[in-house]
């Protein structure tokens, strides 16, 4: 995980946080995945940066629908991530 986030990543993370605090409580819990799509997006942006993190987040949100079973779907390890998954 990079120690310094790009300005683009910071903006997107801030937008996700606004969604988490203002919109998500009104909609109620309905994400099919663990972690939630918004948490996944924040982690993907932190781990991969704005371009790849955004792409992973969009792919994840597009999978979050009633025809997909959902389940555990963690963010893939980053290029410098030494943790075992």
From Swiss-Prot:
- Please name the GO terms that the record assigns under molecular function: toxin activity
Cell membrane found in the keyword field: yes
Q: Note the topology in the membrane.
A: Peripheral membrane protein
GO cellular component terms given for this protein: plasma membrane
Swiss-Prot/TrEMBL keywords: Cell membrane, Cytolysis, Hemolysis, Membrane, Toxin, Virulence
The record's listing under InterPro entries reads:
Membr_insert_effic_factor_YidD
Keyword set includes Membrane: yes
Q: Which Pfam families match?
A: YidD
Signal peptide positions on this chain: none
Choose any GO biological process term that the UniProt entry carries and state it. killing of cells of another organism
As for subcellular location, the record says: Cell membrane
Ranges annotated as spanning the membrane: none
Q: What is the protein's major site of localization?
A: membrane
Family as reported in the entry's similarity comment: Belongs to the UPF0161 family.
Primary role: Could be involved in insertion of integral membrane proteins into the membrane. Lyses fish blood cells.
NCBIfam families according to UniProt: membrane protein insertion efficiency factor YidD
Name this protein carries in UniProt: Putative membrane protein insertion efficiency factor
